[in-house]
Amino acid sequence: MGKAVKETRYCKVLRQAKIRDNDVAYGIEKIFVKDLNQEEIRFVYFKDTIRMEEQLVARPLDLPEDDLIRLMELSIKQNVFSKEFVGKLKDILDK
């Protein structure tokens, strides 16, 4: 496990791909959940608030398909997903 992008009590953010759109940002992260001792993929939504820029919002991420494609492409380029995952995804799409 490499150096964390960010660390909280809950997890370490190992890798992150994020797209900014005015006062919000959305992304995909590879995280290490401390209590479960496992890596997971997390879809995230951030909003600028008075307290801080890009505060994590605890809600589902809703995106138009075009934005999801952009985010998936960026996540693949920034190695958020493992090569094994990308290969399996490619196999599904090739069927």
Which residue ranges define each predicted feature?
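Short non-domain terminal segments
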Residues: 8, 30, 41-44, 79, ...
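Weak global preference for isoleucine
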Residues: 13, 19, 28-31, 41, ...
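A short, structured beta-strand/loop element
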Residues: 24-59
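Mixed-charge, Lys/Arg-enriched low-complexity segments
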Residues: 49-95
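Negatively charged, low-complexity tracts enriched in Asp/Glu with abundant Ser/Thr
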Residues: 1-25
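Short linear sequence motifs
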Residues: 3, 19, 36-39, 74, ...
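Secondary-structure boundary/capping motif
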Residues: 12-14, 38-40, 62
